[in-house]
Amino acid sequence: MTNFEKVGTFMKTRKEYDSIGKINVPVDKYWGASTQRSKKFFDIGEFLVRPRLIKSIAIIKKAAAIVHRKEKQIKPRISNAIIKASNEVINGKLDDHFPLKVWQTGSGTQTNMNAVSYTHLTLPTIYSV
C-alpha cells in the first residue's frame, strides 16, 4: 500500500492511494491521499481549519471508540489506540498534521478525511496496533 521514494534531494515521500489514484505524500506527515490533494487543489488563502474544529472531531472519534468498545464492536486494544491518538489531537500535540485551509468544497469532507487518515496512519506506526 505504501511505497517510499526520495523526491529531489530534500523530501522523502510515500505513495498513498485512493479512488482517484496515487499521490506522493511526505513521509513525516500523518495524512493520506485526500488531504494531499486538498492541499494541492484548494490552496486558497492563508487561514487553516481552526484547531477547535479539529479537536471537536477528535472528541467525537474518542467518544465513538469508547462506546464501540463498551458494546464489544471493536477490540479494547484498537479502542485504546484510537483514544490515545484522539487525546494527542485534543491536546494539540499533532496540529502540524492538519494542514487544510478553511476554503474547501463546502461539505467539510477534506477535513473529515484528514482526521480519518490521521487515525488510520498513526495506529499501526505509533501505537503498535
Language model segments and positions:
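Conserved, well-structured ligand/cofactor-binding cores
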Residues: 4-121
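Single conserved hydrophobic/aromatic residue that forms the stacking wall/gate
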Residues: 120-129
